UniProtKB/Swiss-Prot annotation:
The chain crosses the membrane at residues 3-23, 36-56, 78-98, 101-121. It is found in: Cell inner membrane. The gene is arnF. GO terms for biological process: lipid A biosynthetic process; lipopolysaccharide biosynthetic process. It comes from Shigella dysenteriae serotype 1 (strain Sd197). Heterodimer of ArnE and ArnF. The keyword Methyltransferase does not apply. It is a multi-pass membrane protein. This is Probable 4-amino-4-deoxy-L-arabinose-phosphoundecaprenol flippase subunit ArnF.
Length: 128
C-alpha cells in the first residue's frame, strides 16, 4: 500500500512539474510584476494551469505523507527520483514541450532505473 501511495505521489508531482513549467513559459515574467498580477487576476488558461500545478504539489505532499506511514524512508525516498524520468520522457513525447534527447540524459535515466531496481528487487536469503 505504501508503494502505491508513493507512485501516486511521483505521478502527481510529475504532472504538477509539467503544469508549472507550462505556466512559467506562458505567463509574463515576474520582472513585469503588474502584467504578471493582471494575468493571474484575469484567471485565464495560464493562471488556471499554474493553480493546477500548485494544487498538484499539495496533493502530492498528502500522498507522500501516506507513503511515509507505510513504506521505509530508504525505499520511499528513492521513488522520488522517478519523477525526473517521467518529466524527461513527457517533455519529449508531449507536443510543444521541446524536450530533447541526449545520451547524457539517457545515461542518467539508466542510472536512476538501475538504482531503483537494486533497492526494490527482492533479495534472496542466504543459508549459512
Amino acid at each position: 500500500m505504501g508503494l502505491m501511495w508513493g507512485l501516486f505521489s511521483v505521478i502527481i508531482a510529475s504532472v504538477a512539474q509539467l503544469s508549472l513549467g507550462f505556466a512559467a513559459s506562458h505567463l509574463p515574467p515576474m520582472t513585469h510584476l503588474w502584467d504578471f498580477i493582471a494575468t493571474l487576476l484575469a484567471f485565464g488558461l495560464d493562471a488556471r494551469i499554474l493553480l493546477l500545478g500548485l494544487l498538484g504539489y499539495l496533493l502530492s505532499v498528502f500522498c507522500w505523507y501516506k507513503t511515509l506511514h507505510k513504506l521505509a524512508l530508504s525505499k520511499a525516498y528513492a521513488l522520488l527520483s522517478m519523477s525526473y524520468v517521467l518529466v524527461w520522457i513527457a517533455s519529449m513525447v508531449l507536443p510543444g514541450w521541446g524536450g530533447t534527447f541526449s545520451l547524457k540524459a539517457l545515461l542518467g535515466v539508466a542510472c536512476i532505473m538501475s538504482g531503483l531496481m537494486l533497492i526494490f528487487l527482492p533479495t534472496t536469503k542466504q543459508r549459512y
